[in-house]
């Protein structure tokens, strides 16, 4: 298989539709799968989730739930009314008529949640019981990656951990570089990926418009648009792009049932990457081919950067997307390869370090800041200005910078930060910091 085809295949594996925040719907998917294997609505469910999963489910609204939040609500939605065949669209078919049954199940207090205390940042295990039967379904590493299905003493499905990791997107993309991804994107026949990119433009634009028209969360997108309208902000592409991206997150975190095309396992990253480039292309009269090359490069390069950090971490995911936006903008501006890389370096140097305090309404603020950082990074690179190597976390080049960020993100200090954030969010900071 050619290197180009590997990246095309990776794009189709990586960019998938999801309704709502990916962590709650992943739990709903796991719960629906568990119920299907059990063959009954469970009498009792024990949920074991990694700290990062708990962090990202605590504060967001579950789509189609009538405003419910939390792990128990996500699991109950999947158990009572989820369709496991739809994966991350598992609860897209839930109606108002289903909600009384979901509420009734929650009132039984039969769902218990435990911190799995695993080194794996993205981990879910659901153990469900019905009379004498017990089913275990386990997910690792990604939101749809089933690694174990067991009913009573029978292992129905199991994947060896080493073999499983070698087939994951993160392992595949790690064998590339920003330079190679750029070269492939520059010469790619975009007709090979147009169906996927058509869907990205359509779905992500739809939820952005939803967030601009209706009131969700802190309304960051609407706030920026209002600032443009009343003259507090300038009516320019930088502000319009920030409004578009953050509005999509407002709607998504606020429980909109509209689908989002994800990237790097995150709908917010998918929105952050795509909407500024769509707005820029529209504003500057760029061709569909120019936009699609930029989207391909932005998505794949962000997956590459995120692969060294992890799907879930103490670092805010959309800040990695800032680098992808910068690369995509630089490509649409037909800047040199050197300036494309310098745009990415500037973005990473300027925005990386924002912590992830779980999926919540403030994600849209972080997304707006990530978009602003991307535009500023490209402007600086166009003017010949780049953060000097070895200033802070910046390495000799773009690869060295990404490597340094990976060290920062995966080290002991950041793991302790993650624990402290979770402690603050769950009211257990004193216990965690002992």
UniProtKB/Swiss-Prot annotation:
It comes from the Bacteria. InterPro entries: Ser_deHydtase-like_asu, UPF0597. GO terms for molecular function: L-cysteine desulfhydrase activity. Signal peptide: none annotated. Pfam families: SDH_alpha. GO terms for biological process: L-cysteine catabolic process to pyruvate. Belongs to the UPF0597 family. PANTHER family: UPF0597 PROTEIN YHAM. This is UPF0597 protein Fphi_1065.
């Amino acid at each position: 298989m050619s290197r180009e085809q590997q990246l095309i295949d990776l794009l189709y594996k990586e960019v998938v539709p999801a309704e709502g925040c990916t962590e709650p719907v992943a739990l709903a998917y796991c719960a629906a799968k568990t119920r299907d294997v059990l063959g009954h609505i469970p009498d009792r469910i024990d949920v074991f989730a990694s700290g990062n999963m708990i962090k990202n489910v605590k504060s967001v609204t579950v789509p189609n739930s009538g405003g419910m939040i939390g792990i128990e609500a996500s699991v109950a939605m999947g158990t009572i009314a989820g369709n496991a065949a739809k994966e991350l669209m598992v609860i897209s078919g839930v109606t108002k008529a289903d909600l009384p049954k979901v509420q009734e199940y929650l009132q039984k207090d039969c769902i218990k949640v435990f911190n799995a205390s695993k080194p794996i940042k993205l981990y879910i295990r659901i153990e469900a019981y019905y009379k004498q039967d017990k089913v275990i379904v386990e997910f690792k590493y990604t939101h749809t990656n089933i690694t174990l299905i067991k009913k009573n003493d029978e292992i129905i499905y199991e994947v060896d951990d080493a073999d499983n990791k070698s087939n994951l997107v993160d392992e595949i993309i790690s064998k590339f570089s920003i330079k190679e991804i750029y070269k492939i994107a520059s010469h790619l026949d975009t007709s090979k990926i147009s169906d996927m990119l058509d869907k990205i433009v359509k779905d992500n634009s739809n939820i952005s418009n939803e967030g601009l028209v209706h009131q969700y969360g802190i309304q960051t997108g609407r706030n920026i648009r209002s600032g443009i309208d009343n003259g507090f902000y300038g009516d320019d592409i930088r502000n319009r792009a920030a409004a578009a991206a953050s509005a999509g997150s407002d709607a998504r975190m606020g429980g909109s049932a509209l689908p989002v095309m994800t990237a790097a396992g995150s709908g917010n990253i998918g929105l952050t990457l795509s909407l500024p480039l769509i707005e820029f292309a529209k504003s500057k009269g760029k061709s569909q081919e120019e936009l699609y090359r930029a989207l391909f490069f932005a998505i794949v390069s962000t997956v590459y950067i995120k692969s060294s950090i992890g799907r879930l971490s103490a670092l805010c995911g959309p800040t990695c997307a800032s680098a992808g936006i910068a690369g995509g903008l630089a490509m649409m501006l037909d800047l040199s390869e050197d300036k494309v890389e310098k745009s990415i370096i500037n973005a990473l140097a300027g925005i990386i370090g924002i912590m992830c305090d779980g999926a919540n309404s403030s994600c849209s603020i972080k997304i707006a800041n990530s978009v602003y950082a991307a535009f500023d990074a490209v402007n600086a690179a166009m003017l010949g200005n780049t953060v000097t190597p070895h200033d802070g976390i910046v390495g000799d080049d773009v690869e060295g910078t990404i490597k340094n960020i990976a060290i920062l993100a995966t080290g002991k200090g950041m793991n302790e930060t993650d624990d402290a954030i979770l402690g603050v969010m769950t009211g257990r900071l004193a216990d965690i910091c002992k």
